[in-house]
Amino acid sequence: MAGIEVQILEKKEDSIKFVLKGVHVSFANALRRTILGEVPTFAVDEVEFYENDSALFDEIIAHRLAMIPLTTPVDRFELDALELDDYTVTLSLEAEGPGIVYSGDLKSDDPDVKPVNPNIPIVKLAEGQRLVFNAYAKLGRGKDHAKWQPGFVYYKYYTIVHISKSIPEWKELKKLAKKRGLPVEETEEEVLVTTIKPFYIPKDFEEYEGKEIWEEIVPNTYIFTVETNGELPVEEIVSIALKILMRKADRFISELQKLTS
């Protein structure tokens, strides 16, 4: 992966935005698809009900349980491996109404695998209603079901908006770009705005678009935004995805060499 550059633009607890330089669009899309479909997390896969007097069918409750994000310990599992660890965690519940059953009421037999948010409502129980079940969580991948997706990811082309100083009110656009927190450079003839965030041209300037105002796409450079559901730290999601990509490439090269030898 020589020649690749990464510049972090913004880092929050649940998201990261970075510039990826020196790669073809096919690699950028492969990274996006790997994050969504290949990075494994824990999620409820099966539920065994013993009692359910609630207003919801077993299937509906099971679906709600499956979509609750569960913490996934990075240090205990080889998440970048191409074969997943066959490990099951049991989350049990025994509740009686009246009241609302929340994700925090689930009791896990593994303290490292538990609901990310304890305040997700599952079902409301009326007086005398009971809900008893065991939910079994295992590692899986988003390509098999969305419940295993670690988060959300998208990318856009890295572009530079050129604004000619022949426009009478060009300073207004420069001021607007700075207000948006966008990098602004200036030459004798034009203003250059790097769109690390959206930059919308006001209607008053639409007549200049395409000539005095035009957008340059910087080759092989993309702005990624990755958000986590909470199962994994956001930087780990990107790191694991890159390792999986490299492992897949190594396996492909190995199989190709077998065919040509």
Swiss-Prot record:
Gene3D superfamilies (UniProt xref): 3.30.70.3110, DNA-directed RNA polymerase, insert domain, RNA polymerase, RBP11-like subunit
Protein name in UniProt: DNA-directed RNA polymerase subunit Rpo3
EC number: 2.7.7.6
SUPFAM superfamilies per UniProt: Insert subdomain of RNA polymerase alpha subunit (SSF56553), RBP11-like subunits of RNA polymerase (SSF55257)
Localization per Swiss-Prot or TrEMBL: Cytoplasm
Protein role: DNA-dependent RNA polymerase (RNAP) catalyzes the transcription of DNA into RNA using the four ribonucleoside triphosphates as substrates.
Record organism: Pyrococcus furiosus (strain ATCC 43587 / DSM 3638 / JCM 8422 / Vc1)
Catalytic activity: RNA(n) + a ribonucleoside 5'-triphosphate = RNA(n+1) + diphosphate
Any GO BP annotation: DNA-templated transcription
Subcellular location, principal: cytoplasm
The protein's assembly and partners: Part of the RNA polymerase complex.
Ranges in coiled-coil conformation: none
Enzyme kind, highest EC tier: transferase
Keyword 4Fe-4S included in the entry's annotation: no
Gene Ontology terms: cellular component: cytoplasm; DNA-directed RNA polymerase complex
Family, as annotated: Belongs to the archaeal Rpo3/eukaryotic RPB3 RNA polymerase subunit family.
UniProt entry keywords in alphabetical sequence: Cytoplasm, DNA-directed RNA polymerase, Nucleotidyltransferase, Transcription, Transferase
Name of the gene this protein is made from: rpo3
UniProt-listed InterPro entries: DNA-dir_RNA_pol_30-40kDasu_CS (IPR001514), DNA-dir_RNA_pol_insert (IPR011262), DNA-dir_RNA_pol_RpoA/D/Rpb3 (IPR011263), RBP11-like (IPR036603), RNAP_Rpo3/Rpb3/RPAC1 (IPR022842), RNApol_insert_sf (IPR036643), Rpo3/RPB3_RNA_Pol_subunit (IPR050518)
GO molecular function: DNA binding; DNA-directed RNA polymerase activity; protein dimerization activity
Domain of life: Archaea
